[in-house]
From Swiss-Prot:
The gene is mraY. GO terms for biological process: cell division; cell wall organization; peptidoglycan biosynthetic process; regulation of cell shape. The lineage of its organism: Bacteria, Bacillati, Bacillota, Bacilli, Bacillales. Its cofactor is Mg(2+). Pathway: Cell wall biogenesis; peptidoglycan biosynthesis. PROSITE patterns: MRAY_2. It is a multi-pass membrane protein. Belongs to the glycosyltransferase 4 family. MraY subfamily. Keywords: Cell cycle, Cell division, Cell membrane, Cell shape, Cell wall biogenesis/degradation, Magnesium, Membrane, Metal-binding, Peptidoglycan synthesis, Transferase, Transmembrane, Transmembrane helix. This is Phospho-N-acetylmuramoyl-pentapeptide-transferase. The chain crosses the membrane at residues 5-25, 52-72, 77-97, 117-137, 147-167, 176-196, 202-222, 227-247, 253-273, 302-322. The keyword Cell cycle applies. It comes from the Bacteria.
Length: 324
């Protein structure tokens, strides 16, 4: 019965997101909350300048309302839901401030890297402290095995790394119309299946609410995008998916299910290291999706390819997390 309720959860979040977006997009235009495009980015992206941003607010509202309604209905409103909403709201707020400074204060870089890192660190510490207070253990499980290691306080460092790194990795992926919306829906969908297998229904409800919310947003975010989620959405989704992996004790599996985010991040790291040490670039541009654009791929082809890779990695992650 609850499994059917999870589909209803996704459906409700989808409908809320689809209903809110047409109302919110004109509001963003009226406020002149338009995306500015970097000059050093692909030239084809210049036509996107002025597209409303901060649409991640729609994703958050749709997800939060649906999660609370369904968690209460199925009597799964507990510490897990509170922690997930805390992280999503906290990282979403950081993203909102970053977007606000960019579009309203006209400061292209938004928050400074130190300001952003400090905010991410505070949210991550709060998450760990609350989880530890709820009796959350510090074991790390090797996916597909019964092997676990107690990391003790080193687990605290792992949590910080996952939440901060995860939010930034997902943020890097949000560079093409619909790219992040699609890959996020796939990844959260995979974790919802693992959550059901573990009978962690509160986490499953949250994941399916996110799936519905981002798919509803994708209707307006697919190429050509009528709205961007901005850092408001991408940082929130990144923090949320890392928190989900931590609560499910599938920390290492996040590397597989979130493989697209990992590849995007590695491409940036490799590019920076290569340029600083040799003066040469490995990729035509990073993150990786821009490299393929400059190789002549259409934006839609890049997006669908990355969705496909994300789907295959999600299937692999489900196989390891559920059946191995």
């Amino acid at each position: 019965m609850l499994e059917q309720g999870l589909l209803v959860t996704a459906g409700v979040a989808f409908l809320i997101s689809v209903a809110l977006s047409p109302l919110f997009i004109p509001f963003l235009r009226k406020l002149k909350f338009g995306q500015s495009i970097r000059d050093e980015g692909p030239k084809s992206h210049q036509k996107k300048s002025g597209t409303p941003t901060m649409g991640g607010i729609v994703i958050y509202v749709s997800m939060m309302v649906t999660t609370l309604i369904m968690a209460i209905k199925f009597e799964h409103l507990g510490a897990e839901v509170s922690l997930l909403l805390l992280v999503t709201f906290g990282y979403g707020l950081i993203g909102f401030l970053d977007d606000y400074i960019k579009v309203v204060k006209k400061r292209n870089l938004g928050l400074t890297s130190k300001q952003k890192l400090l905010g991410q660190l505070i949210i991550a510490i709060a998450f760990f402290a609350i989880a530890k207070g709820q009796g959350f253990d510090t074991h790390l499980m090797i996916p597909g095995t019964d092997i676990t290691f107690d990391l003790y306080w080193a687990y605290f460092i792992l949590v910080l790394f996952m939440l901060i790194g995860g939010s930034n990795a997902v943020n890097l992926t949000d560079g093409l119309d619909g790219l992040l919306s699609g890959t996020a829906a796939i990844a959260f969908g995979a974790f919802s299946i693992i959550a059901v297998a573990q009978e962690q229904y509160a986490v499953a409800i949250f994941c399916m609410a996110v799936v519905g919310a981002v798919l509803g947003f994708l209707v307006f975010n697919a190429n050509p995008a009528k709205v961007f989620m901005g850092d408001t959405g991408s940082l929130a989704l990144g923090g949320a998916i890392a928190a989900v992996a931590i609560l499910l004790k599938q920390e290492l599996l996040l590397v597989i299910i979130g493989g697209v985010f990992v590849m995007e991040t590695l491409s940036v790291i490799i590019q920076v290291i290569s340029f600083k040490t040799t003066g040469k670039r490995v990729f035509k541009m990073s993150p990786l999706h821009h490299h393929y654009e400059l190789c002549g791929w259409s934006e839609w082809r890049v997006v669908v390819t990355f969705w496909s890779v994300g789907f295959l990695l999600a299937v692999l992650g489900i196989y390891i997390g559920v059946w191995m």
